[in-house]
């Protein structure tokens, strides 16, 4: 009970169809950033729209430069482009569309799927935010598979992010395992 009140779970209006992949851990934010274009390209090749969630405007701009270098068309939704928000969100669910967004695409942002996208698996969300709050992770992931549509999401963490610096023994173990091989570690959810 919160504030002395009972809590009631409100069921979904339609069954949830989101597929959540196991989280991936990367040695550094740099290694993670280098891996994003290949993942995005693979999803776009399937005809799926992709939303990549990042923490800051600077990260959005850096990722935009990486995607440009890889020849991947995309839109950026951040505080610098807030006047275009409605147009970017309206296009974000179209087949093969890539959107890079800061937390502006969080709670309350409903990305509608374009023609044929549901049959291809729906919107895929790649959450590359290292949030101290699980609520913010859920908001990012929650952009996929809304209103009974199919969709998928995955969370990619960078072990050099500030949230991991005070994590104790479990983070220390992950760091030691990460040193055994470069790049990403897949860990069970």
Predicted feature residues:
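Conserved phosphate/anionic-ligand binding catalytic regions in large, soluble enzymes, centered on
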Residues: 1, 93-112, 135-157
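Interdomain helical connector at the RecA1-RecA2 junction of SF1/SF2 helicase-like NTPases
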Residues: 1-27
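Generic beta-strand/beta-sheet core signal
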Residues: 10, 53-55, 70, 77, ...
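Conserved nucleotide-binding/hydrolysis micro-motifs of P-loop NTPases
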Residues: 13-17, 56-59, 81-83, 104-108, ...
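Conserved interdomain hinge at the start of the Helicase C-terminal
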Residues: 20-51
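Conserved motor-coupling elements within RecA-like helicase/translocase cores
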Residues: 45-46, 57-122
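C-terminal helicase module of SF1/SF2 nucleic-acid helicases/translocases
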Residues: 117-189
């Amino acid at each position: 009970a919160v504030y002395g009140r009972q809590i009631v779970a409100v069921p979904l209006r339609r069954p949830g169809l989101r597929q959540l992949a196991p989280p991936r851990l990367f040695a550094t934010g740099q290694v993670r950033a280098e891996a994003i274009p290949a993942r995005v390209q693979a999803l776009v090749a399937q005809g799926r729209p992709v939303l990549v969630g990042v923490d800051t405007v600077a990260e959005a701009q850096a990722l935009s430069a990486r995607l440009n270098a890889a020849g991947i068309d995309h839109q950026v939704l951040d505080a610098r482009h807030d006047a275009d928000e409605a147009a970017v969100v309206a296009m974000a669910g179209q087949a093969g569309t890539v959107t890079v967004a800061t937390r502006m695409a969080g709670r309350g942002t409903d990305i509608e799927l374009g023609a044929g996208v549901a049959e291809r698996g729906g919107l895929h969300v790649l959450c590359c935010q290292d949030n101290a709050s699980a609520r913010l992770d859920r908001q990012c992931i929650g952009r996929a598979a809304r209103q009974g549509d199919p969709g998928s999401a995955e969370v990619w963490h960078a072990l050099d992010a500030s949230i991991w610096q005070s994590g104790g023994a479990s983070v220390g173990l992950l760091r030691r395992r990460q040193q055994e091989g470069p790049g990403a570690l897949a860990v069970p959810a």
